[in-house]
Amino acid sequence: MPEEIPWGGTKVDDAYWQFFCDLLGEGKMKQFKEECMDDYLDFFRKFEVQKRRGPSEALETIYIRIPMSLYDTLDNEIPEAISLSKYKDAVSFDKRSLKLKMNFKLFENFFTETCKQIRSRLLKLWDENDLTNVKTALLVGGFSECHIIQNMIKELMKEKQIHLILPNEPALAVLKGAVYTGHVPESD
């Protein structure tokens, strides 16, 4: 049963934004957004790629390319901002490549609240509805490409002894199904 809930990729984007506000200062981030909109949008597009196809294991390190315009907005003081932040042990910055390096655990924290809410909603659905006959679940949509979300859902399905189907291209699965149904109406 498809359902739109307010705990998808946008909430993860909000956590990402908040991380940079905490790290570099909300005023500077707002200035970057207002004065360098193209770079700001590109910065979040790149995060979208990391979010969907990013690391699948906790051993990996995450690299985030900082746009030159953001670096300039901060008056080249990113290392100092990091050293004064609560993230000083989890984040470092390479001035030559303009890359912020963070451990996987910190990256995973962007998803914590979203995962908690999705899990809670699924458990509530099982409790409120008679879903004891459900033996298979289908995970589709762009957000389901994210390894962190996949792992959380896989773990929950395993607990509930439900077989999980994850198509090769989950972001396109709904579209492909709609096109197929439109061309072969008796397929439903």
Residue locations for each model-derived region?
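Short beta-alpha connecting loops at secondary-structure transitions
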Residues: 2-5, 30, 159-166
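Conserved A3 ("GATE") glycine/threonine-rich loop of ANL adenylate-forming enzymes
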Residues: 6-14, 168-182
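Conserved phosphate-binding/catalytic loops in two-lobed NTP-binding clefts
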Residues: 153-177
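A long, glycine-enriched binding/interface module in the latter
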Residues: 37, 171, 188
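Gly/charged contiguous loops adjacent to phosphate- or pyrophosphate-bearing nucleotide/cofactor binding elements
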Residues: 4-152
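A polyampholytic, Gly/Pro-enriched intrinsically disordered region
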Residues: 182-188
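Active-site catalytic pocket residues across diverse enzymes, especially alpha/beta-hydrolases
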Residues: 20, 153, 157, 182
